[in-house]
Amino acid sequence: MNKESKDDDMSLGKFSFSHFLYYLVLIVVIVYGLYKLFTGHGSDINFGKFLLRTSPYMWANLGIALCVGLSVVGAAWGIFITGSSMIGAGVRAPRITTKNLISIIFCEVVAIYGLIIAIVFSSKLTVATAENMYSKSNLYTGYSLFWAGITVGASNLICGIAVGITGATAAISDAADSALFVKILVIEIFGSILGLLGLIVGLLMAGKASEFQ
């Protein structure tokens, strides 16, 4: 009984703390907005002005960084899930360790996808003149590389997790019955295609973006 009440108190504490942070941020945003409104500076809160005044180089570099970063996180996460299960199951069945290394390779390919796309995107980062920095062409290139990088990075992140979970299941199933490995490997291959789809979509999104001028 004491243990259950202690668990309830801990969950209630976590619940209250998360809500406290949420309402604190909400109150700060509302107070700041009302302050700007009642002091005659309501026009300062202008998201469109923020987009137009922010350098397109920042958006492009941020998209490239997210592309590589999320892809590496997805690959590392998948390798962690697959590797821990493979090592644990390999204690009982050492024969599975070599065969299940293909799952680690599938996870590592996810990071390579992100690196390739980052290299392709970085080729558009040429030096622009100060007069044409905020031209329509440069703004489009910056926004395009930003959202394309997020698309590729998020796809590779999800792909790495999916391949990692499937690879872990394949290792455990192979330890119990070697005939199940090939069947689960087919599912793992379909999961790895998710990263390839994100790569193609990212190339299509940034395909019409010209170099900075």
UniProtKB/Swiss-Prot annotation:
Membrane-traversing stretches: 15-35, 62-82, 101-121, 145-165, 184-204
For the Cytoplasmic compartment, the record's topological domain ranges are 36-61, 122-144, 205-213
Q: Which Gene3D superfamilies match?
A: lithium bound rotor ring of v- atpase
Biological process GO annotation list? Answer: endosomal lumen acidification; Golgi lumen acidification; proton transmembrane transport; vacuolar acidification
* Keyword annotations of the record: Hydrogen ion transport, Ion transport, Membrane, Transmembrane, Transmembrane helix, Transport, Vacuole
- Gene Ontology MF terms: P-type proton-exporting transporter activity; proton-transporting ATPase activity, rotational mechanism
Topology: which residues are Vacuolar?
A: 1-14, 83-100, 166-183
Location comes to:
Vacuole membrane
Give the site residues for Essential for proton translocation.
Answer: 108
Q: Name one Pfam family in it.
A: ATP-synt_C
GO CC annotation terms, alphabetical = fungal-type vacuole membrane; Golgi membrane; membrane; proton-transporting V-type ATPase complex; vacuolar proton-transporting V-type ATPase complex; vacuolar proton-transporting V-type ATPase, V0 domain
InterPro entries on file = ATPase_proteolipid_c-like_dom, ATPase_proteolipid_csu, F/V-ATP_Csub_sf
Outcome, altering residue 108 to D: Partial inactivation
- Write down the membrane topology: Multi-pass membrane protein
Which family does the entry's similarity section mention?
Belongs to the V-ATPase proteolipid subunit family.
Oligomeric state and partners? V-ATPase is a heteromultimeric enzyme composed of a peripheral catalytic V1 complex (components A to H) attached to an integral membrane V0 proton pore complex (components: a, c, c', c'', d, e, f and VOA1). The decameric c-ring forms the proton-conducting pore, and is composed of eight proteolipid subunits c, one subunit c' and one subunit c''.
| Protein role | Proton-conducting pore forming subunit of the V0 complex of vacuolar(H+)-ATPase (V-ATPase), a multisubunit enzyme composed of a peripheral complex (V1) that hydrolyzes ATP and a membrane integral complex (V0) that translocates protons. V-ATPase is responsible for acidifying and maintaining the pH of intracellular compartments.
Descriptive protein name: V-type proton ATPase subunit c''
Q: Which organism is it from?
A: Saccharomyces cerevisiae (strain ATCC 204508 / S288c) (Baker's yeast)
The root-end lineage is: Eukaryota, Fungi, Dikarya, Ascomycota, Saccharomycotina
The record's gene field reads VMA16
